[in-house]
Amino acid sequence: MLNLPRLLYPLYERRLLKELNGARQPGHVAIMCDGNRRWAREAGFVDLSHGHRVGAKKIGELVRWCDDVDVDLVTVYLLSTENLGRDEAELQLLYDIIGDVVAELSLPETNCRVRLVGHLDLLPKEFAERLRGTVCETVDHTGVAVNIAVGYGGRQEIVDAVRDLLTSARDEGKTLDEVIESVDAQAISTHLYTSGQPDPDLVIRTSGEQRLSGFMLWQSAYSEIWFTDTYWPAFRRIDFLRALRDYSQRSRRFGK
């Protein structure tokens, strides 16, 4: 029996690519990879960790999709500060999976420039050291830049940025009045985990949840947001292209 949707997907994909040809596209896409466990549960898996494993494989695909349409930077939200409150067995599984994802993205043939964004001191020391050691190998790569948000919380990032700003001012011998005078949005931005990078143009969240849950709380102030009911393990290239098409049709106002 013919699988009609599967036959139509390539045609729909070509149509989307045609619509995107010459259209305005985001330079930075941030994505919240949500719905792994729900996908596994609804797919009938007894071991819900299977959802995390399938979702992990999707990340490499996402990076290739970004490369295909000239998205320069992608931020992938993998582990929040709130997630660190899960039971130890699930956390250890997540650490192993995330470590493998970062290792795969850091391979020479993948050519990604990988950066960690998050409060890494909240992570187990061995896991954090593994991640740091792996991403160091990508410094000379020239492909898509990939931020891995791990141990990340939007409020925590702003707190860390302010602390870093104040520490720098103290080390420079500035007075309190000088510090107060120097604090503005740009000053805080230079101390964020993503310092030196553009804010996300487009934020995508899978799984049907319609909130950002503190993801890139500072940087997403003027981002376009795209929600989809699709769980992350089931997220397809046509879903990604639909998000880009929707973005290209919006009029960005940047708060004006």
UniProtKB/Swiss-Prot annotation:
Source organism, top-level taxon: Bacteria
Give the GO cellular component terms, alphabetically: plasma membrane
Q: Which UniProt keywords apply?
A: Magnesium, Metal-binding, Transferase
Q: Where does substrate bind?
A: G35, N36, R37, R38, W39, H52, S80, T81, E82, R86, R205, R211, L212, S213
As cofactor, the record names: Mg(2+)
How is the cofactor bound, in the record's words?
Answer: Binds 2 magnesium ions per subunit.
EC number(s): the record gives 2.5.1.-
State the Gene Ontology terms under molecular function. ditrans,polycis-polyprenyl diphosphate synthase [(2E,6E)-farnesyl diphosphate specific] activity; magnesium ion binding; Z-farnesyl diphosphate synthase activity
Q: Which residues form the active site?
A: D34, N83 (proton acceptor)
Q: Name one Pfam family in it.
A: Prenyltransf
GO terms for biological process? polyprenol biosynthetic process
Residues that coordinate or bind Mg(2+): D34, E224
Role description:
Catalyzes the condensation of isopentenyl diphosphate (IPP) with allylic pyrophosphates generating different type of terpenoids.
- UniProt similarity note: Belongs to the UPP synthase family.
HAMAP family per UniProt: ISPT
Subunit annotation: Homodimer.
- Protein name according to UniProt: Isoprenyl transferase 1
Question: Which species is this UniProt entry from?
Answer: Corynebacterium efficiens (strain DSM 44549 / YS-314 / AJ 12310 / JCM 11189 / NBRC 100395)
Biological classification of the source? Bacteria, Bacillati, Actinomycetota, Actinomycetes, Mycobacteriales
